[in-house]
Amino acid sequence: DIHPHGFARESVFDLKSIGENTVTFVLTENEKTLSQYPFRFRLEVTYTLEKNTLSTTYAVTNTDDKEIFYNIGAHDTYAISTDYENYEIEYEKPENILDNGLFEKNEPAVEEPTEQMKRICIKSNIVPGKTVYFFSKNLNSSWVQLLYKGNPIVRVYFDKNNTGSLVWHISYI
């Protein structure tokens, strides 16, 4: 059985290459991965830094003799200031954020959701260890970013120890 968060996060990646503004790591099947995921593969993760933007690229190669199935659901983490009210989420295009976009079970994620929102200010009363959910009717954007005073950072989960770790999880199925 595969762990709910997958096997790659618990695996040791090899360094493939280092460039002026990129680094690539590679993971291939091994005895441990094959016990959870019965396919031969090559997963390359490349991080590219351009100006103030960090991009992550995933490349999966089927090295097996049969069709493989996979999903990338990354949980990148970055250290940030704990002054959460200084942050906002910006969508590429205006989105229809539902009233039931949640901060916690019954608490709205935004102060006053509007029909079309491009930027959402993060509430100052974030509870460490809680995940913030923003539900959209039909997502129009191909990207979402978190801004801090004009500098893009990325990703939204606030760690329970309130150390300023921030995680954003997007999974495409």
Q: Which positions does each model-derived feature cover?
A:
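Active-site/ligand-binding surface loops and adjacent short beta/alpha elements
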Residues: T77-N161
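Residues that act as N-cap/strand-start positions at coil-to-secondary-structure junctions
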Residues: F7-E10, F39-F41, I72, D83, ...
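Acidic (Asp/Glu-rich), glycine- and aromatic
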Residues: F41, T57-E88
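A C-terminal functional module that forms or caps the active site or interfaces directly
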Residues: Y157-I173
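Extended, loop-rich substrate-binding clefts of extracytoplasmic carbohydrate-active enzymes
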Residues: I2-K51
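Hydrophobic residues positioned within well-ordered beta-strands of beta-sheet architectures
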Residues: V23-F25, L43-V45, T56, I72-A74, ...
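Beta-strand elements of well-folded, non-transmembrane domains
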Residues: E29-E31, L49-K51, N62-D64, D76-I80, ...
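Structural motif
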Residues: T22, T53-S55, E67, W143, ...
